[in-house]
């Protein structure tokens, strides 16, 4: 409990803001695939494709949103407008679930809602955590505890969201999904109001300077200027060259992925953007050689992390459908909503978060702690074993017979130990 005391009040504002925003995201995710299949009557393949495209863009847009915040907007503006767009998205989802009698309108409202959620997430997610570090002096011993508190808020929101939104929306009646989306929308609106009304009271650096207003790139440039550190500049010829490179690369990738994903232009756009945007950032002439090399290393690590998150995000799609259709959820005569399984992740992380650091500390004292890449490899191995675990449980299942929830619970437990194992690398 002592670790919770002695922190700037701004940390608790960020804690509350992140808790509410993660409630919004995970609440919507808990019921989304069920809404698509049970209310909008998409077949499973189409619903999974929509979910996959949505999730892919949710992970892609922070790359752009972080760049915009760093170069132009600043963190405060990005957090505010990100939350506003997500609130609009959630209320559009509510409207979609309220107009099921008009299928075409419901579909368009759903797609519009997803668009706003994607854009809002891109602005919000990469920026809010950056505020935590700016509340403290470099090297402050309280910083580790501060990030622990911050991520605890993330887990509180992601734990409560499936329970509440699932209770309201995942009832078996397609018309009730709207209440789950409404709850998520209200929490996002709460995020907007809370952050906007309290930011000027609590978000200050130890020196008393307001944080998150000036874009980091401009602030660092001003500091470098004071320290006589120069950054390279792009001349007109370099800008034209970079424009040609990006144009040609985009055209080639669109043609290539268009051939692979015939007719699926969302996937074509996602895969193209996943390559073009990283290249575009590397071509930024204001980057120093050291900054560019660090970004390149991040890209290499990110390539392998993609496989982890591709399997991890099955929680919102195939695993939720499996929970709904193939899992016996009866508990003493009461059937647990399928969406509630998504609360197991944050529940297990709270428990295991106290175990994994001790394991690494134990190994470190004996000079046996593996390197960060090795930890990631172990994490991917554990993730694959988790899916093998559930395969063992369902391999003999016959049509019409549901399997015990112990198999899905075991998979979620393994997934969470996997995530803690990998995330500790950072």
Q: For each predicted feature, which ranges?
A:
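Hydrophobic core of transmembrane alpha-helices in multi-pass small-molecule transporters
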Residues: 103-124, 399-419
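Intracellular loop-helix junctions on the cytosolic face of multi-pass helical membrane proteins
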Residues: 1-9, 138-139, 166-320, 324-330, ...
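Central cavity-lining transmembrane alpha-helices of secondary-active solute carriers
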Residues: 52-69, 343-356
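Glycine-rich segments within core transmembrane alpha-helices of 12-TM secondary carriers
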Residues: 58, 144-163, 185-188, 345
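Single conserved hydrophobic/aromatic residue that forms the stacking wall/gate
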Residues: 420-425
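C-terminal ends and interior cores of transmembrane alpha-helices
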Residues: 84-104, 381-400
């Amino acid at each position: 409990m002592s670790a919770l005391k002695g922190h700037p009040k701004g940390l608790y504002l960020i804690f509350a803001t992140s808790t509410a925003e993660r409630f919004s995201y995970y609440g919507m995710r808990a019921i989304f695939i069920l809404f698509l299949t049970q209310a909008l009557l998409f077949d499973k393949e189409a619903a999974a494709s929509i979910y996959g495209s949505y999730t892919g863009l949710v992970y892609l847009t922070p790359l752009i949103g972080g760049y915009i915040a760093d170069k132009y907007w600043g963190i405060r503006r990005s957090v505010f407008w990100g939350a506003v767009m997500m609130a609009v998205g959630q209320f559009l989802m509510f409207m979609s679930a309220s107009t099921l009698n008009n299928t075409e309108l419901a579909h368009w409202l759903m797609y519009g809602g997803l668009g706003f959620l994607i854009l809002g997430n891109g602005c919000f997610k990469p920026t809010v955590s950056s505020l935590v570090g700016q509340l403290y002096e470099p090297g402050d011993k309280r910083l580790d505890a501060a990030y622990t508190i911050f991520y605890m808020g993330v887990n509180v929101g992601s734990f409560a969201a499936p329970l509440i939104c699932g209770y309201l929306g995942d009832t078996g009646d397609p018309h009730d999904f709207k209440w789950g989306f409404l709850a998520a929308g209200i929490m996002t609106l709460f995020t907007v109001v809370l952050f906007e009304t309290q930011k000027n009271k609590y978000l200050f650096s130890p020196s008393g300077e307001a944080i998150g207003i000036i874009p980091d790139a401009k602030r660092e440039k001003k500091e470098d200027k004071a320290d006589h550190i120069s950054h390279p500049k792009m001349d007109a010829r370099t800008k034209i060259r970079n424009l040609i490179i990006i144009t040609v690369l985009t055209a080639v990738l669109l043609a290539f992925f268009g051939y692979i994903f015939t007719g699926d232009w969302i996937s074509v756009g996602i895969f193209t953007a996943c390559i073009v945007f990283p290249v575009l950032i590397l071509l930024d002439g204001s980057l120093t050689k050291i900054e560019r090399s660090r970004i390149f290393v991040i890209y290499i690590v990110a390539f392998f992390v993609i496989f982890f998150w591709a399997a991890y995000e099955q929680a919102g799609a195939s695993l939720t459908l499996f929970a709904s259709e193939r899992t016996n959820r009866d508990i003493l005569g009461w059937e647990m909503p399928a969406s509630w399984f998504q609360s197991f992740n944050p529940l297990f992380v709270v428990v295991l978060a106290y175990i994994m650091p001790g394991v690494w500390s134990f190994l470190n004292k004996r000079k046996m702690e593996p390197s960060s890449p090795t930890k990631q490899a172990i994490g991917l191995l554990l993730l694959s074993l988790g899916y093998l675990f559930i395969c063992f449980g369902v391999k003999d299942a016959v049509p019409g017979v549901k399997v015990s929830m112990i198999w899905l619970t075991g998979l979620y437990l393994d997934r969470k130990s996997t995530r803690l194992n990998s995330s500790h690398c950072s």
